Amino acid sequence: MSSLRIAMFLLVVLMVLIDCSTAIPAADKERLLNEVDLVDDDGSIETALINYLFTKQIVKRLRNQLDIGDLQRKRSYWKQCAFNAVSCFGK
């Protein structure tokens, strides 16, 4: 549950940054985008790869958090089984 809160918080922060950056003039917008670096950008392929992999990992975690319908379905199934084993496993 706390990871869902963290993901939602990051999503809200990202939305606020995007909203603020659209209202900022182009020169300030470019400066703001250049200040947000995952790893110090020295132009090397290793740095670009680290940034790519880190971003890919974050996106994967966010996508996994969005698919909670399946988890809720499984949870309700196991609750039913815990309450009435015959309904799950038969006689």
Swiss-Prot record:
Modification Phenylalanine amide occurs at: 89
Highest taxon of the lineage? Eukaryota
Propeptide residues, per UniProt?
24-59, 73
Q: Which GO terms describe its cellular component?
A: extracellular region
Q: Disulfide connectivity?
A: 81-88
Q: Does the keyword ATP-binding apply?
A: no
Q: Which UniProt keywords apply?
A: Amidation, Cleavage on pair of basic residues, Disulfide bond, Secreted, Signal
Question: Signal sequence span per UniProt?
Answer: 1-23
Where would you find this protein in the cell? Secreted
Q: What is this protein called?
A: Prohormone-1
Organism of origin is Apis mellifera
